[in-house]
Amino acid sequence: MKYVLIQATDNGILRRAECGGAVTALFKYLLDKKLVDGVLALKRGEDVYDGIPTFITNSNELVETAGSLHCAPTNFGKLIAKYLADKKIAVPAKPCDAMAIRELAKLNQINLDNVYMIGLNCGGTISPITAMKMIELFYEVNPLDVVKEEIDKGKFIIELKNGEHKAVKIEELEEKGFGRRKNCQRCEIMIPRMADLACGNWGAEKGWTFVEICSERGRKLVEDAEKDGYIKIKQPSEKAIQVREKIESIMIKLAKKFQKKHLEEEYPSLEKWKKYWNRCIKCYGCRDNCPLCFCVECSLEKDYIEEKGKIPPNPLIFQGIRLSHISQSCINCGQCEDACPMDIPLAYIFHRMQLKIRDTLGYIPGVDNSLPPLFNIER
């Protein structure tokens, strides 16, 4: 049993959740059976552009986290390592979440035995500011009137307060400089097979979640949750499996196309990079937001490096140190770029460097248990 279709048996979950409610139902099972201390999930805040990481210990509150929030990109890796390392938890994990968690585990920051990862297939996320501008421009509505959004069949779909639905092809949005975040456009890992389960709507029947079982723990979770009546399962058709594989293949080809565009054809010149680095105000947002930056004592704050009062900082020192520390483990989550108030395209250089390491040494961060290259050198 590698692939299954799953549907929640709880009507409340079915009404609120996406495509069958499998993820929420499995979290409810884990909490009710006290297999975890809590679930770290994203809860909607003021609107669809505001996602709040929330640690839930009462299964009745899980339904508040059901549904998608594509316009509130975040990463759970650092939150787990910093605040929940001693807890047994479950987490909904996009590929970059799962990669960060697994990479941090290699660096002894997270104990994977304490983390159930329910993976979420991901075709990309949209920054909240971009989303609001995009909705106003292309959908011709007030962004604050949007009550729900989803990505389906290559379209970004919104639902308004009056129940009206509007959709635009993502390809059209991205041709105009909107749509998914640039790092998401380049990402070729859409199915989080490094998690215990990988869940999504690709190939799924209406009202069901298509689930790929990726670990023995994931298999046992599905079997036990079905036995105790939390979910219903059935086998997907061969055609459904093929549809899912085809969608993944198309998305990977598109990602490679964007990699070539961003990291080769449009990659900034040295002169352009100098202009970017001169914008830096040394706010440390890139470091603080990076899920793989975890040192208690940061090299960037050493007296002999910090150059107190100097803005912009020397890029060979400031960003050079970050590159040497992070590039081998960069998961292309884009959090550094999102945090930068000066719009420096940081993910370009980090992702480009990681791809060179991948192509040279064969190392892909966060997909398996192999150590990063600098930790795995033979004398």
Swiss-Prot record:
Function: Catalyzes the oxidation of formate to carbon dioxide, with coenzyme F420 as the electron acceptor.
Subunit structure: Dimer of an alpha (FdhA) and a beta (FdhB) subunit.
Known catalytic reactions: oxidized coenzyme F420-(gamma-L-Glu)(n) + formate + 2 H(+) = reduced coenzyme F420-(gamma-L-Glu)(n) + CO2
Cofactor(s) this protein cannot do without: [4Fe-4S] cluster; FAD; Zn(2+)
Any one GO molecular-function label of the UniProt entry: formate dehydrogenase (NAD+) activity
Cited Pfam families: Fer4 (PF00037), FrhB_FdhB_C (PF04432), FrhB_FdhB_N (PF04422)
Cofactor note: Binds 2 [4Fe-4S] clusters.
Keywords annotated in UniProt: 4Fe-4S, Electron transport, FAD, Flavoprotein, Iron, Iron-sulfur, Metal-binding, Oxidoreductase, Repeat, Transport, Zinc
Organism: Methanocaldococcus jannaschii (strain ATCC 43067 / DSM 2661 / JAL-1 / JCM 10045 / NBRC 100440)
Keyword Zinc in annotation: yes
InterPro entries: 4Fe4S_Fe-S-bd, 4Fe4S_Fe_S_CS, Co_F420_Hydgase/DH_bsu_N, FRHB/FDHB/HCAR-like, FrhB_FdhB_C, Helical_ferredxn
Enzyme class: oxidoreductase
Name by which UniProt lists this protein: F420-dependent formate dehydrogenase subunit beta
Phylogenetic lineage: Archaea, Methanobacteriati, Methanobacteriota, Methanomada group, Methanococci
Residues in 4Fe-4S ferredoxin-type domain copies: 271-301, 321-351
Family under the similarity heading: Belongs to the FrhB family.
Top-rank lineage group of the source organism: Archaea
Binding site for [4Fe-4S] cluster 2: 290, 330, 333, 336
Keyword Mitochondrion listed: no
Chain sites annotated for binding [4Fe-4S] cluster 1: 280, 283, 286, 340
Entry EC no(s): 1.17.98.3
